[in-house]
Amino acid sequence: MQAQKLEKSLLWEISGNGLEKSSYLFGTIHMTCDASLDDNIKIALDNTTLLVLELDMDDPNMQTEMMKGIYMKDGKTIKDLVNEEDYELLGAFLKEEIGMPITMVGNIKPFFLTAMMYPKLLNCTVQSFENELIKVAHEQEEEVLGLETIEEQLNVFEAIPYEDQVTDLLRSAKDNMAYDKETFQKMLELYDAKDLEGLNTMMMEDKNLSTTKHKDVMLDNRNENWIEKIEGFSKKQATFFGVGAAHLPGDNGVINLLRKKGYTVKAVL
């Protein structure tokens, strides 16, 4: 079943197929300048009794678990992945951007080093929709759970070869993040326009990102694994799901996968 073209919305109602109450699916962006929640999101949060994000961000062990998984396996370091010239370039770049010498951070997976620089892509104090959603859940005294464990999420990054991860980092170093800034701006514009189709096209066409090259690992496989959990939670109680917007559109996106299972998934406009 091919995905129908999606209306411009970030909030979707899941109903039918034996569900007693509707659940809601909201596409987040993990970093933005303004993460205020629209009225229709607040209403959906009022009508649900559980918040489920990609990860259970209320888990007190989250940081510790995350720290365990940020290092490359088998004692590998960036020095093993690049030539001398690129190593020096990366050294200067990391010192400038995160204030640490490469000898200290060289054993961290390149993906995480790239992620440490994400806040620099925005000229503002970074806000996150996940944090705003958690605040509301706490006010409503509701539980916050996750669709995957930290371990499962870390395995995703383990499945992408370190060579590909370091290629992304090198590109950022070579153009001083100009490409990243431009791409992220485009992504924010599409997100603010609630244009999931546009986001999907951008992800599919951006040959520079290892996320595109490894879309199956980053998005598709995870979406597939989440469906059973989304069903399980929704059957028990009205649930509000908040996941990265890139997971929603496309043939293998969460919206189409739920429709294939027989659920009605409609845009809340």
Residue ranges and their predicted role:
Residues 1-7, 12:
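Bacterial Sec-dependent N-terminal signal peptides
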Residues 4, 34, 219-223:
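A conditional alpha-helix N-cap/helix-loop micro-motif detector
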Residues 4-6, 17-18, 45, 233:
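A generic structural signal for short, solvent-exposed coil/turn residues
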Residues 7, 37, 129-130, 223-226:
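Amphipathic coiled-coil/heptad-repeat helices and related helical stalk/stem segments
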Residues 10-12, 191, 226:
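Tryptophan-centered motif/residue detector
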Residues 14-24, 29-210, 214:
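Structured, acidic catalytic/metal-binding patches in enzyme active sites
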Residues 212-269:
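A cross-kingdom marker for long, charged
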